[in-house]
């Protein structure tokens, strides 16, 4: 628990002996991790690692960093928009958080929620259930599955420039945004709007980055998941 606390302090770039000492250890590990991530992405980009089709349209909602950036509420909102337009969506998730699964089932009870660590298998299962489109929660790094749209979320709460795991919370460098179709900077309430606008402006100056917009939502009242 103490190590986790110090790691969070390192990610927030706080001073002190603990984060500084941990940073000395984490820096070479982050460099190795970055090399592995870039190599993997390169192999997918050139086709050396294959990507397979789910045989129906796939929209992936993902992020670059670990932790919450609003993927779950955005996925639920997107599913409702698809239903209104006549689609029959399914939601595929890795199932790492039980609360997220319960929320999806509460928000859209008529929509199948498929738990599959191999997102491609989950997408194919949705086809067997008569679905005609899939929304994948946390699918950006699952490159084995082809998708029509990649939406990537960023939080203004994360410090920039990004640092890769374990030195920082990022799973991929910013250059990975170039394979997305849309980048959304999430503003949770009015207090984050100013910092979200600043991050959007910074991202729009980067070459090769796709469309970048702000997605703002207001937290609602507490509600029990058992109704």
Model-derived features: where do they sit?
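Beta-strand-loop-alpha "switch" segments that mediate conformational coupling across diverse proteins
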Residues: 212-221
């Amino acid at each position: 628990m103490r190590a986790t606390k110090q790691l969070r302090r390192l990610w927030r770039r706080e001073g002190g002996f603990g984060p500084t000492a941990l940073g000395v250890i984490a820096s070479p590990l982050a460099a190795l991790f970055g090399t592995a991530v870039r190599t993997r992405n390169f192999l997918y980009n050139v086709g050396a690692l294959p990507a397979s089709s789910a045989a129906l349209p796939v929209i992936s909602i993902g992020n670059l960093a670990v932790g919450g950036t609003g993927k779950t509420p955005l996925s639920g909102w997107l599913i409702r928009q698809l239903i209104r337009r006549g689609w029959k969506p399914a939601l595929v998730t890795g199932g790492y958080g039980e609360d997220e699964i319960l929320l999806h089932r509460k928000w859209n009870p008529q929509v199948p929620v498929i738990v599959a660590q191999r997102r491609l298998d989950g997408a194919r299962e949705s086809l067997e259930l008569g679905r005609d489109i899939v929304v994948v929660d946390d699918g950006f790094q699952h490159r084995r599955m082809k998708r029509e749209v990649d939406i990537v979320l960023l939080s203004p709460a994360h410090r920039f420039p990004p640092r890769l795991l374990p030195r920082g919370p990022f799973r991929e460098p910013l250059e990975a945004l170039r394979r997305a179709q849309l980048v959304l900077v999430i503003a949770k309430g009015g207090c984050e709007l100013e910092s979200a606008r600043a991050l959007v402006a910074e991202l729009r100056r980067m070459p090769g980055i796709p469309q970048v917009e702000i997605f703002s939502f207001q937290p609602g009242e507490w509600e029990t998941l058992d109704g």
